[in-house]
Amino acid sequence: MQNAIATIKETNPIVLTVANNVTPADVANGLNALGASPMMSQTPEEADDMVNIAQAAAINLGTLNPHQRGEMEAVMEAAKKYHKPTVLDPVACGATMYRLRVVTELLHQYHFTVIRGNAGEIATLAGVEWQSHGIDAGEGNADLEKVARLAAEKLGSVIVLSGEVDIVTDSTRLARLPYGSPAFKTHVGTGDMLSSLIGAFLATNDDAFDAAVDAVTTFTLCGQAVEDQRPGNWYPGLLNNLDAVTDQQLAAWQ
């Protein structure tokens, strides 16, 4: 990581997020704290204009519905048109046949620069047997590095597999990032925040693998460094750390 955080704080990249209905404020506050500029839309008719002025786009399947799917497709068409990097968060894609069908069709139609999910979600995309548990990772016996590499090879995207140790791979390069905290599980929406924060790093780095590694490292270390890890105090501390963090501070935490 070389001045990645400083670049975001100086350039304020706009990240368009097609959010779910549960965590949009968390996503917006996380982006804003780091120094990026959050933008959200639920209207397919303005997707072209929104993507044109944004530096990256993130799509979240959290509260999937037919209208949201139309917005996703409009955003991805515009991202292809304007050559903007994109992030997919395939929330609970293995939980229902409807979600699996939608995400399969999206991945057939469009290429995503980065895909971030938990073990169950990434295993589903890789075609590996896994017992999903709603939005949570669930259970499985597969080697997670192999699962992530398989998904990257299959989809041609950088894969971020979130867990106790986060895995980032483009199928050739692979990073294991052991900077997490149990507190992340206590606040619904931290995964959504990370997916959109990856967009901010993609906006300022043409190497998608490096950008994803930088994003995961920054976010997880900011969470790990919060002194009070109790749920009610940890989340404000996470935002405070995202706001105050510098490249030098991050290096010291590592």
Swiss-Prot record:
GO terms for molecular function: ATP binding; hydroxyethylthiazole kinase activity; magnesium ion binding. GO terms for biological process: thiamine biosynthetic process; thiamine diphosphate biosynthetic process. SUPFAM superfamilies: Ribokinase-like. It catalyses: 5-(2-hydroxyethyl)-4-methylthiazole + ATP = 4-methyl-5-(2-phosphooxyethyl)-thiazole + ADP + H(+). Substrate binds at residues 40, 189. Gene3D superfamilies: 3.40.1190.20. Keywords: ATP-binding, Kinase, Magnesium, Metal-binding, Nucleotide-binding, Thiamine biosynthesis, Transferase. Coiled coil: none annotated. Its EC number is 2.7.1.50. Its cofactor is Mg(2+). ATP binds at residues 116, 162. Pathway: Cofactor biosynthesis; thiamine diphosphate biosynthesis; 4-methyl-5-(2-phosphoethyl)-thiazole from 5-(2-hydroxyethyl)-4-methylthiazole: step 1/1. It is an enzyme of class 2 (transferase). It comes from the Bacteria. NCBIfam families: PRK09355.1 (NF006830). Belongs to the Thz kinase family. Catalyzes the phosphorylation of the hydroxyl group of 4-methyl-5-beta-hydroxyethylthiazole (THZ). HAMAP family: Thz_kinase (MF_00228). This is Hydroxyethylthiazole kinase. It comes from Limosilactobacillus fermentum (strain NBRC 3956 / LMG 18251) (Lactobacillus fermentum). The lineage of its organism: Bacteria, Bacillati, Bacillota, Bacilli, Lactobacillales.
